[in-house]
Swiss-Prot record:
Residues annotated as domain Rab-GAP TBC: 57-265
Record's keyword annotation contains Metal-binding: no
Gene Ontology MF terms: actin binding; GTPase activator activity; small GTPase binding
PANTHER family attached to this UniProt entry: TBC1 DOMAIN FAMILY MEMBER 21, TBC1 DOMAIN FAMILY MEMBER GTPASE-ACTIVATING PROTEIN
Biological role stated in the UniProt entry: Acts as a GTPase-activating protein for Rab family protein(s). Essential for the establishment of male fertility, and is required for both the production of normal sperm number and sperm function. Plays an important role in the formation of intact mitochondria, outer dense fibers and axoneme within the sperm tail. Essential for sperm mitochondrial sheath formation and for the interactions of ARMC12 with VDAC2 and VDAC3. May be involved in acrosome formation and cytoskeletal reorganization during spermiogenesis, possibly by regulating RAB3A activity.
Protein name: TBC1 domain family member 21
Length: 336
């Protein structure tokens, strides 16, 4: 067991306070540009920028460019000229992947049953997406989205297609202009978040660590969840598979949380602290009504239209509480 530094706890509490008080507005284009010198090299530290993103967020006009740094699409050490070269390379690589896919598609159709099944699943999922805004304007191109999802499935050997990827990819398509940007940002997002939303890689680990965290911080609640509420925590896998996007009131709230996850602030695997904070929202009701697993799951599924800043702030407070304690090595290794 290791006690973590109180300075980290103070920093996390300060971040939580900054988020709610909103002492400064989100980082806008003028401020973002001030982070770089004339050649496009970073003039501020990466840590400084990431802490500001945690505490303040990004203005929508900045998000596209900032996410390219946060995901690793661009190196933080690159110049403007180097970034132009990298973007051109990523465009060419995407085009080459598309050409490769067109060549091997007949082979995949004939030899791999999983390919045909997955392609049909993607097509069905795409049709479920509501692609218009309240005024009836078309938001996304479903054909382009389907193509990118298929290519992602064929090229990504680690993260097979799963339900939820279509909604996640849609948010990337809404953020950027070009298909190669959508494709690469999604791949880098999965890598940067340690595949935490992928069922066969990160989701089970998240659920196990969520149970461990509840046991450590809230033994009374943990006892109920292990008894009458058995199975409830393991049933929360959609939170991680969809990266919480169905819990928020707007796309901006989803992007706000995701960009915090990308900063790695205030810690790694922040998504588990977010899930813990959401469970705390139903805790009193669960205990007072002595809910069973199905009712707990229903109460959790009713957590919608959440405010991202409030949830991020609550999770920062949980982290501050956690690191003041004698933390088990498993939790320390997971969050640090």
């Amino acid at each position: 067991m290791t006690t973590l530094s109180p300075e980290n706890s103070l920093s996390a509490r300060q971040s939580a306070s900054f988020i709610l008080v909103k002492r400064k507005p989100p980082i806008d284009k003028t401020e973002w540009d001030s982070f770089f010198d004339e050649s496009g090299h970073l003039a501020k530290s990466r840590d400084f920028i990431c802490v500001n993103i945690l505490e303040r967020g990004l203005h929508p006009f900045v998000r596209t460019e900032a996410w390219k740094f946060l995901t690793g699409y661009f190196s933080w050490q690159s110049s403007q000229d180097e970034r132009l070269t990298v973007d051109s390379m990523r465009r060419k690589n995407y085009k080459a992947l598309c050409q490769m896919y067109e060549k091997i598609q007949p082979l995949l159709e004939n030899l791999h049953r999983n390919f045909t099944e997955t392609r049909n699943n993607i097509a069905r999922d795409i049709q479920k997406i509501y692609d218009k805004d309240p005024l009836g304007n078309v938001l996304i191109d479903k054909k382009r989205l389907e193509k990118i999802l298929l290519l992602s499935y064929v090229c990504n050997t680690q993260a097979e297609y799963q339900q939820g990827f279509h909604e996640m990819m849609m948010l990337f398509q809404l953020m950027v202009e070009h298909d190669h940007e959508t494709f690469w940002l999604f791949q880098f997002f999965l890598q940067k978040t340690e595949h935490s939303c992928v069922i066969n890689i990160g989701v089970a680990k998240n659920l196990d660590m969520l149970s461990t965290l509840i046991t450590f911080l809230d033994p009374v609640f943990a006892e109920h969840l292990k008894g009458k509420g058995a199975g409830a925590v393991q049933s929360l896998f959609p939170w991680f598979c969809f990266c919480f996007q169905r819990a928020f009131k707007s796309f901006d709230d989803v992007w706000r949380l995701w960009e915090v996850l990308l900063t790695g602030k205030p810690c790694r695997n922040f998504q588990v602290l977010v899930a813990y904070s959401m469970l705390q929202m139903v805790r009193e009701q669960v205990l007072q009504e002595s809910m069973g697993g199905d009712d707990i799951l229903l109460a959790c599924n009713n957590l919608i239209d959440l405010d991202a800043d409030e949830l991020i702030s609550a999770a920062c407070v949980v982290y501050a509480e956690l690191i003041q304690k004698d933390v088990p090595q498993t939790l320390k290794d997971f969050f640090l």
